[in-house]
């Protein structure tokens, strides 16, 4: 019984270590809280930010169009 308990404990610890390592990789992935949108006069797909005034910084947006009360922001 002690050997089985020890083996389960080792497997549990290994699973926690590998899960934590996988979560560390996920932290560096970019994540936007925006929906896709389209505006006439702007090529391609933009990001629709709901109930927001200007385009948020840090995402590299170069142009936008307003769809009141939302904004559609376009990357370069």
Curated annotation (Swiss-Prot):
InterPro entries associated with the record: BDS_K_chnl_tox, Myo_ane_neurotoxin_sf
Annotated coiled-coil segments of the chain: none
Domain of life assignment: Eukaryota
One function term, GO molecular function aspect: potassium channel regulator activity
Intracellular or extracellular location(s): Secreted; Nematocyst
UniProt GO cellular component terms: extracellular region; nematocyst
Chief location bin: secreted
S-S bonds: 37-72, 39-65
PTM field: Lacks the conventional Cys residue at position 55. Thus, only 2 disulfide are possible present.
Keywords assigned: Cleavage on pair of basic residues, Disulfide bond, Hypotensive agent, Ion channel impairing toxin, Nematocyst, Neurotoxin, Potassium channel impairing toxin, Secreted, Signal, Toxin, Voltage-gated potassium channel impairing toxin
Keyword presence, Disulfide bond: yes
Known function: Blocks Kv3 voltage-gated potassium channels. Reduces blood pressure.
Family designation: Belongs to the sea anemone type 3 (BDS) potassium channel toxin family.
Protein name: Kappa-actitoxin-Avd4n
């Amino acid at each position: 019984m002690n050997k089985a308990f020890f083996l389960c404990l080792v497997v549990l610890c290994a699973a926690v270590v590998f899960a934590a390592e996988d979560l560390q990789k996920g932290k560096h992935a970019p994540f936007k809280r925006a929906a896709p949108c389209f505006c006439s006069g702007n090529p391609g797909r933009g990001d629709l930010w709901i109930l927001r005034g200007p385009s948020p910084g840090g995402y590299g947006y170069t142009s936008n169009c307003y769809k009141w009360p939302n904004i559609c922001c376009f990357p370069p």
